Amino acid sequence: MATTSKILFRGAASTSSTLLYTVPASTTTVVTDIVITNTAASSATYELLLNDIVLAKTVTVGANDSTIIQLKQPLTATQTVKGLASAVTVNFHISGVEIA
């Protein structure tokens, strides 16, 4: 089995629920870190779902601040990570390990 450390998603959040990552076929992914940054001068909120189960719901990230979520959450083939935020000034950086 090949194990590959990987950036699963890096980019700006949408204000509606958006698919950020889908586990490829015949693969298990372990999500290890999620960094949420807010580049605005006012606070914003975000939501994250792992396979449609809420991980974080309407969590505030302060103005010009970051939040780090460290976890070891396995996802199997076709499972997803989704997210959204109250403003497009929120960015997600999601990393993990793919095992194929």
Positions of predicted regions on the chain:
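Cysteine-clustered segments with highest specificity for TGF-beta superfamily mature ligands
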Residues: 79-83
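Beta-sandwich interaction modules
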Residues: 65-78
